[in-house]
UniProtKB/Swiss-Prot annotation:
It comes from Lactobacillus delbrueckii subsp. bulgaricus (strain ATCC BAA-365 / Lb-18). This is DNA mismatch repair protein MutL. One of its GO terms (cellular component) is mismatch repair complex. Keywords: DNA damage, DNA repair. One of its GO terms (biological process) is mismatch repair. InterPro entries: DNA_mismatch_repair_CS (IPR014762), DNA_mismatch_repair_MutL (IPR020667), DNA_mismatch_S5_2-like (IPR013507), HATPase_C_sf (IPR036890), MutL/Mlh/PMS (IPR002099), MutL/Mlh/Pms-like (IPR038973), MutL_C (IPR014790), MutL_C_dimsub (IPR042120). Gene3D superfamilies: 3.30.230.10, Histidine kinase-like ATPase, C-terminal domain (3.30.565.10), MutL, C-terminal domain, dimerisation subdomain (3.30.1540.20), MutL, C-terminal domain, regulatory subdomain (3.30.1370.100).
Length: 653
């Protein structure tokens, strides 16, 4: 049996470092928090090679006396608490006295510090051992330089991400700290280039502008609320300014950034149903009695125990709701918007031109079925007056079609006998084009959940849909038949599958049709997002987004893919947001993600189909990569055999 023995101080420091110092961003966090606790009003962070080579944090705080330097690098030595009572009444960001000892255990550290006297102190540590200490000259404050992180624990280096990812983590933590302390001027520089600078004038909205961009700051609403235990102040975005993840929500408790799902959910509850499944940009600063907060539950202190959490949640929800109500009251009661042609709202639209050279992406189900094929090369953007005249003529024509459809529509449409007088012609060239566009491997997702009334044959045949005979439709669902089996088709999911297949095929073949802009559009980003997107410009070009770096956290867009529909700036912003929030790293997975989101955005509502439109939908599903579901896994087709129908009606029992 092995004997119990006491571990060396250096080994215990390395063990502690494993909990506290995970990556370069952890070093930055600990040193900046120490500077804040030292009452600094200016803090400068400089990193080289994403902090892997060197990290420097300089402040104008109180400094450390010469005879206290050794103690500062000893484990569990601190000036922030004195006894057990202080442990439950913590008013500082740090309190354990582990940070400097943990950093010095896994890196080379040099400190230059002064309390404002005539003599400053310079000292160096490596592997937890002091190398030297000497007098020096310096203004009041402290500068700590950390180099060669994990030099003596190379196994830790294997778990670090790419330099770009490590830099983004540093940017993120500095952003959060800056939002929690608008009274402090914070500067972050990487390899000599300034990424962030806040003025330190206490103006939170100005810090939001510096971090997320001026346009975001202009759409932020002030939230305020308080009760006997908590004081809440912050900024939340208008309901129409959203992101696809919670990453833009910062909750700061007594100046400390924390992660708390319940408080985040309380924030979302304040928006009601206005977010549409997305998330706002928000900064909530909460002041609470330290006795209500237990910080000593997590090595990085990002998770805390909070008394009266439900009361605080209600406070947050009511504050956000009130801010949004004030915004609604300030908005115009009535707004004039362009009136759309009724056929664009009530009828599915086509752009199927089999006899025309495909110079642009066919906008599936988005143009009128009666539309005459346009000349080759004609773009979606036309002369306004000409478009209006054309739309009026088409509107009249389509109304007549709808009337005829209601009075003379057959009971079903045989897919093999679609007539030319339906004003829709299928040709071999178009059929071949569809096959080429949609010949993709099966959807790489999980197994589809089996329907209670779906036989095993469905699962075996789900990658192949037979030629169906249309029976009818009801409220956006199609009913069809083949071989005595009944097929139920959700037209939205089916259209999304076809849209997904076509967009993905274009992306993978790099055959995007683009719409150029007379003047480029400017997109502002946070420092974090800007740094991430700069490296993805080649991928954006593959997606059909021609963008270039414009500096100052902005990108210029010169053209966009024609499969983006709706308001261009909104659609592009949502697409970029999806890329930023995605955890996918390989290009193919990102292309699938973009295609799926674009299909979901482009096809969002059920409409009544004409017989020809329904026939075409079923025909094209035969060549889909997975006709039985859309890219998100939503069921598109359900097959009921005669045996299934008998079971439903309990026949034979």
């Amino acid at each position: 049996m092995a004997k119990i023995h006491e571990l060396s101080e250096n080994l215990t420091n390395q063990i502690a470092a494993g909990e506290v110092i995970e990556r370069p961003a952890s070093v930055v966090k600990e040193l900046v928090e120490n500077a804040i606790d030292a009452q600094a009003s200016r803090i400068r962070v400089e990193v080289q090679h994403s902090g892997l080579k060197q990290i420097s944090v300089q402040d104008n705080g109180s400094g450390i006396a010469p005879d206290q330097v050794d103690l500062a690098f000893m484990r569990h030595a601190t000036s922030k608490i004195q006894d057990e009572h202080d442990l439950f009444n913590i008013a500082t960001l740090g309190f354990r006295g582990e940070a400097l000892a943990s950093i010095a255990a896994v890196a080379h550290v040099e400190i230059l510090t002064s309390t404002g006297g005539q003599t400053a102190t310079r000292a160096a540590f490596a592997g937890g051992v002091k190398k030297f200490q000497e007098d020096a000259g310096s203004a009041k404050g402290t500068k700590i330089t950390v180099g060669d992180i994990f030099y003596n624990t190379p196994a830790r280096l294997k778990y670090l991400k790419s330099p770009k990812t490590e830099l983004l983590k540093i940017v993120d933590i500095v952003n959060r700290i800056a939002l929690g302390h608008p009274e402090i001027s914070l500067t972050l520089a990487s390899d000599g280039k300034v990424l962030l600078r806040t003025p330190g004038n206490g103006n939170l909205k100005q810090d939001v502008a510096n971090i997320y961009g001026r346009k975001v700051a202009e759409k932020m609403l002030t939230v305020e609320n308080e009760d006997p235990d908590f004081t809440l102040y912050g900024l939340v975005s208008e309901a129409n300014l959203t992101r696809s993840s919670r990453n833009f929500i910062s909750i700061l408790l007594n100046g400390r950034y924390i992660k708390n799902y319940q408080l985040s959910s309380a924030l979302l509850d304040g928006y009601g149903n206005k977010l549409g499944g997305k998330y706002p940009i928000a900064v909530l600063a909460i002041e609470a009695d330290p006795l209500l907060v237990d910080v000593n539950v997590h090595p990085t202190k990002e998770e805390v125990r909070l008394s009266k959490e439900k009361e605080l949640s209600r406070l947050i929800t009511s504050a956000v709701t009130e801010a949004l109500m004030d915004e609604d009251e300030a908005s115009p009661l009535f707004q004039l918007t362009p009136f759309k042609d009724k056929t664009q709202l009530d009828q599915l639209e086509f752009n199927l031109k089999p006899n025309v050279v495909d110079t642009r992406r066919p906008d599936d189900f988005q143009l009128e079925v009666s539309q005459v094929a346009e000349p080759e090369g004609k773009t979606d953007i036309t002369n306004k007056k000409g478009t209006e005249t054309k739309e009026k003529a088409e509107k009249k024509e389509n109304k007549q079609e709808e009337k005829e459809e209601k009075t003379s529509a057959p009971e079903y449409v045989d897919l093999n006998q679609v007539r030319e007088d339906d004003q829709y012609v299928l040709t071999k060239s178009w059929d071949q084009h569809v096959k080429e566009q949609t010949a993709l491997p099966p959807f790489a997702g999980g197994e589809e959940a089996a329907s209670p009334v779906t036989s095993k044959a469905d699962q075996l045949l789900r990658q192949h849909l037979p030629a169906l005979r249309l029976l009818g439709q009801m409220e956006g669902y199609l009913l069809a038949e083949h071989g005595g089996d009944l097929y139920l088709i959700d037209q939205v999911a089916a259209r999304r599958r076809l849209e997904y297949d076509q967009i993905l095929a274009s992306l993978e073949k790099d055959e995007n049709y683009q719409q150029g802009l007379l003047e480029p559009l400017v997109f502002d980003f946070s420092v974090y997002d800007y740094q991430k997107l700069k490296d993805q410009l080649p991928l954006l070009r593959q997606l059909g987004l021609e963008m270039e770096d414009f500096g100052q956290n902005t990108l210029l867009m010169h053209s966009y893919p024609t499969w983006l529909k709706g308001e261009v700036t909104v659609q592009v912003r949502e697409l970029l947001d999806q890329l930023l929030s995605s955890r996918e790293n390989d290009g193919k997975s990102l292309l699938k993600l973009v295609a799926a989101k674009a299909a979901e955005s482009n096809v969002s509502r059920r409409v009544n189909l004409t017989g020809a439109e329904a026939a075409d939908l079923l025909l094209r599903l035969q060549t889909a990569s997975d006709p039985y579901r859309d890219a998100s896994g939503q069921v598109a087709v359900v097959r009921l055999s005669q045996n299934d129908l008998s079971k439903l009606f309990k026949k034979g029992k």
